[in-house]
């Protein structure tokens, strides 16, 4: 089995050039003086990934207030990314305000250790990297294909890193910068039904009484 090479905390984040939904980008040159949250998703038009992108977009201003640029990535083509972004806008009324890298040759994914063969040799896992305004890798988190990320925790992580830098301190378990007003709702208790694998299944799925935003993204209570 191929050995996965991972970047290391405290070292410069791997440099790259890539095509995105916002045009070509060059890292770190295009992001000097900014923090970056670079995150990969397994594939466009998949349900868990869609919920993550909706959540990142809804919290975009929170990241912006912290001088953080979001960058998404998968091995899909730019055409697929654009179609998916348009689908998200149509079905959820949400604009995706950050670039998504089209890493079809897996060049960036391999630099950041996003391909884990035991999970998939053709999809990236849910990897996330926090890179500071000096281009240094400060934190990384890997999630399996089945589990969506908690965007509030990503924001808390950024807050903790920036507070540690600014104040010369460390943050304890469960630390938050101030009392939070975030509340969980019934929506947070729903799970995603695996997407259909045939056209017939897709048609049936829409008739089975699940809560479906589109044919590929349906939820239910358990």
From Swiss-Prot:
Residue sites binding substrate per the record: 126
Domain of life: Bacteria
Domain Thioredoxin as annotated: residue spans: 7-163
Annotated CDD domains: PRX_1cys (cd03016)
Enzyme Commission number(s) from the entry: 1.11.1.24
GO biological process, one term: cell redox homeostasis
Key words, A-Z: Antioxidant, Cytoplasm, Disulfide bond, Oxidoreductase, Peroxidase, Redox-active center
Catalytic site: 49 (cysteine sulfenic acid (-soh) intermediate)
Cystine bridges: 212-218
Localization of this protein: Cytoplasm
GO CC annotation: cytosol
Cited InterPro entries: AhpC/TSA (IPR000866), Peroxiredoxin (IPR050217), Peroxiredoxin_AhpC-typ (IPR024706), Peroxiredoxin_C (IPR019479), Peroxiredoxin_TDXH (IPR022915), PRX_1cys (IPR045020), Thioredoxin-like_sf (IPR036249), Thioredoxin_domain (IPR013766)
GO MF annotations, alphabetized: peroxidase activity; thioredoxin-dependent peroxiredoxin activity
Purpose of the protein: Thiol-specific peroxidase that catalyzes the reduction of hydrogen peroxide and organic hydroperoxides to water and alcohols, respectively. Plays a role in cell protection against oxidative stress by detoxifying peroxides.
PANTHER family the UniProt entry points to: THIOREDOXIN PEROXIDASE (PTHR10681), THIOREDOXIN-DEPENDENT PEROXIDE REDUCTASE, MITOCHONDRIAL (PTHR10681:SF128)
Anything else known: The active site is a conserved redox-active cysteine residue, the peroxidatic cysteine (C(P)), which makes the nucleophilic attack on the peroxide substrate. The peroxide oxidizes the C(P)-SH to cysteine sulfenic acid (C(P)-SOH), which then reacts with another cysteine residue, the resolving cysteine (C(R)), to form a disulfide bridge. The disulfide is subsequently reduced by an appropriate electron donor to complete the catalytic cycle.
Subunit (UniProt): Homodecamer. Pentamer of dimers that assemble into a ring structure.
Family: Belongs to the peroxiredoxin family. Prx6 subfamily.
HAMAP family assigned to the protein according to its UniProt record, in alphabetical order: Peroxiredoxin
Protein name in the entry: Peroxiredoxin
Species of provenance: Aquifex aeolicus (strain VF5)
């Amino acid at each position: 089995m191929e050995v996965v090479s991972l970047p290391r905390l405290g070292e410069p984040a791997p440099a790259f050039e890539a095509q995105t939904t916002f045009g070509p980008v060059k890292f770190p040159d295009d992001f000097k003086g900014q923090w970056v949250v670079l995150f990969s998703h397994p594939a466009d038009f998949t349900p868990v990934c869609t919920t993550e992108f909706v959540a990142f977009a809804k919290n975009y201003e929170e990241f912006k207030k912290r001088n953080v640029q979001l960058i998404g990535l998968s091995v899909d083509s730019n055409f697929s990314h654009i179609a998916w972004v348009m689908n998200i806008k149509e079905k959820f009324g949400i604009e995706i305000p950050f670039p998504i890298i089209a890493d079809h040759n897996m060049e960036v994914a391999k630099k950041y250790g996003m391909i884990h063969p035991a999970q998939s040799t053709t999809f990236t896992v849910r990897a996330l990297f926090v890179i500071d305004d000096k281009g240094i890798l400060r934190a990384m988190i890997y999630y399996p294909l089945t589990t969506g990320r908690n965007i509030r925790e990503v924001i808390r992580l950024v807050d903790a890193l920036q507070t540690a830098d600014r104040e010369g301190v460390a943050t304890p378990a469960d630390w938050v910068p101030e009392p939070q007003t975030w509340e969980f709702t019934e929506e947070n208790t729903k799970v995603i039904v695996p997407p259909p694998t045939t056209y017939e299944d897709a048609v049936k799925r829409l008739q089975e009484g699940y809560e479906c935003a589109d044919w590929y993204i349906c939820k239910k209570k358990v």
